[in-house]
Amino acid sequence: MLKRSLTALLISAFACATLNAQEHSRIHQPTLTPQNSGTTNGLIAVWPVNPQVVWASGRAGTFTVTTDGGQTWRAGVVPGAEMLQFRDVQAFSATVAYLMSIGTSGDPTDFRIYKTEDGGITWTIQFENHNPNAFYDGFAFWTPHRGIAHSDSVNGVFPDLRTTDGTTWQDISNMPPALPGEFSFASSGTCVTTQGGRNAWIATGGATIARILATRDGGNTWNAYNTPLASSPSGGAFTVDFRNPFDGIVGGGDLDPANPNSADTAISNDGGQTWTLTNPPPVTGAIFGLSYVGQTGGGGGNNLGRAGVVTANDGGAAWTPDEGNTWFTLPGVSGFWAVAFASPKAGWLVGTDGRILKISF
């Protein structure tokens, strides 16, 4: 959950059992194109609706949106949210989007869900938290009206939320019991992901076991499954994505700077019930965000099949053509929190100082 602030991650690359792009001429690195986000505030989350319409969000109440594939971005600050951080964004068009905020003041009402239906000109607060111990890490939607929001556990219970009308939010009363100390990480808005019309997965850490919480029926019932990712009071599973109902990848690590080589990933081919560690990605620190190249969350193509990208903020970024069997670094890419794709040729990384990179395979 990053507990109000993230520990700075070390900047370095380490040798591991991966392939090198220069050694395999048939592998072509993606094209990376910097774009002007319209803000210098740090960006934390990104959501492409399609190759043209993309939303991103971040610090100081900031959001930014493009309707031309990133040639131009229009940034704004939500009134009344200037002291908040938008740790997640979900959007459905150039006009309809949701933002999820946290704060640093300790006020539980700093967690809010905002919605715009006019492209960010005006925003409505849909939900404001009053649980003094809740800390919400991310949210995800199946449709413009159906979504879930996930919180760290409180007294052994996850006070998660669900909307079925895109307006009101209710408690999910049947979440799996939490392990002692279990929480999630608000690093990129990707500790929660949806797929299809009713599937969702949540990545957790903080306890002795990093787990995946999964639903197949839109949040009516849930199951908890163990992963082999290392977990600790400062580590665990940070980010998860599925390219279909069965095949997914989870990434994590540890925020402890004494453990810089902690990044790990695992894959599942049975909907998250069982997981197998992959070769470690060539990044340092924890993996903040990851995404399949052909698909992000609830939709998109799948042209590159098993290809995916991971980013570890200051620890660099890397991509895999085969779900973690082999890895290639993205040279010079550092300081990015989140990555998401509308299609293989239309992906975006967002990060510190308002930086945006378009990534195209």
Question: What are the residue ranges of the model-derived segments?
Answer:
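Residue-level hotspots at or immediately adjacent to binding/recognition sites across diverse folds
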Residues: 22-361
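Bacterial N-terminal signal peptides that target proteins for export
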Residues: 1-6
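Bacterial N-terminal signal peptides
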Residues: 8-15
